């Protein structure tokens, strides 16, 4: 009987000791490596390549691993397949730019239920499928900035302009369009005559831009709020020999637009730094995976802190204007 009691006590002590060893932090005092699935709208897009560059920078600082993935075309179905793969890999966090806010929510809700920290960036996921969303800037500031550029480029701040957007279901572009329309109240001489959708695909965006130019021969400005669409719009204006007559502006990447800026096709444009966006969302994702809480200000490393509102949305920074005076410098970076 005494031997049995000793054996039981030994087993209890062993279980307790083993549990303590399993729960203890690594011997070197460093936190365990966090794996973050960084999901792009589509691969082969320069904007998201730059996002990944910033994400890898943050991962290096934090001792984390970023798995950069995405579909080959910007569809919800492609992203759902990508997300299911990340869930199967049991990543610690997922950061996604949504092609469709509602279509992704059920899959991401399943990820949340399994303990994966889910955040969106750039283009928001519906609230049911995320803990927080990091907007690159506020929608209001983006709308005001784009309309401000149109007003600067249109003769005497007056005239017609058309817009090439991404997909009809893209959360961020639709919000920016709404704020652009609101900002028009401050510029009564401007008229938005059409919105076309290039689906963030170069060839389709080009065709839509050419169609707008032919349907509205009196356009003063052609705008794109998609980085892919802005390059396509610039090419369309140049190919149609309308440089100088129709100004092109919007949201794009310095590395893709520097040549068009120097030729006067795109006199100026705006964008936040996608490297900073990737860096910031990775800082947030790792912070949450290590026990952080979005009810409190969350560190974004060198970008400072972000405070998320009651809707779970926070803004990184305001857009920056690029023109002939600075585009070459930034083109070397992204």
Regions found by a protein language model. Give the residues of each.
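Bacterial signal peptide processing site
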Residues: 18-22
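Hinge/cleft segment of the Venus flytrap/periplasmic-binding protein
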Residues: 32, 168, 172, 183, ...
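Extracytoplasmic "Venus flytrap"
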Residues: 33-58, 62, 67-81, 91, ...
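Periplasmic-binding protein-like
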Residues: 38-39, 90-98, 117-121, 162-163, ...
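Short, solvent-exposed amphipathic alpha-helices that sit
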Residues: 47-61, 142-149, 171-190, 204, ...
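Hydrophobic alpha-helical segments within soluble ligand-binding/sensing domains
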Residues: 79, 134-161, 204-206, 253-257, ...
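Hydrophobic alpha-helical
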Residues: 96-112, 180, 198-260
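Flexible loop/hinge segments that line or gate small-molecule binding clefts
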Residues: 102-141, 152, 160, 254-262, ...
């Amino acid at each position: 009987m005494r031997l049995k009691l000793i054996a039981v006590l030994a087993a209890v002590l062993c279980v307790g000791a083993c549990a303590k060893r399993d729960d203890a932090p690594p011997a070197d005092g460093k936190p365990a490596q966090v794996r973050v699935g960084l999901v792009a709208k589509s691969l082969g897009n320069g904007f998201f390549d730059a996002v990944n560059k910033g994400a890898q920078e943050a991962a290096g600082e934090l001792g984390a691993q970023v798995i950069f993935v995405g579909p080959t075309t910007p569809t919800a179905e492609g992203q759902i397949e990508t997300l299911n793969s990340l869930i199967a890999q049991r990543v610690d966090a997922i950061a996604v730019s949504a092609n469709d806010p509602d279509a992704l929510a059920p899959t991401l809700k399943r990820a949340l239920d399994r303990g994966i920290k889910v955040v969106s960036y750039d283009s928001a996921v519906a609230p049911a499928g995320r803990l927080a969303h990091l907007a690159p800037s506020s929608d209001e500031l983006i709308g005001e900035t784009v309309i401000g550029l149109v007003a600067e480029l249109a003769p005497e701040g007056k005239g017609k302009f058309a817009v090439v957007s991404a997909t009809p279901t893209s959360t961020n572009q639709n919000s920016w369009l709404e704020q652009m329309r609101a900002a028009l109240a401050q510029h009564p001489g401007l008229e938005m005559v059409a919105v076309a959708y290039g689906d963030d695909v170069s060839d389709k965006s080009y065709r839509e831009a050419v169609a707008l130019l032919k349907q509205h021969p009196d356009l003063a400005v052609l705008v794109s709020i998609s980085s892919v669409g802005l390059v396509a719009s610039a090419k369309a204006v140049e190919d149609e020999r309308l440089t100088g007559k129709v100004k092109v502006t919007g949201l794009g990447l310095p590395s893709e637009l520097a040549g068009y800026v120097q030729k006067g096709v795109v006199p100026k444009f705006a964008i936040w730094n996608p490297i900073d966006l990737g860096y910031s969302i990775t800082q947030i994702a790792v912070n949450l995976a290590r026990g952080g809480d979005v009810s409190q200000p969350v560190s974004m490393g060198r970008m400072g802190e972000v405070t998320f509102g009651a809707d779970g949305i926070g803004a990184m920074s305001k857009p920056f204007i690029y023109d002939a005076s600075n585009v070459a410098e930034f083109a070397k970076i992204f």
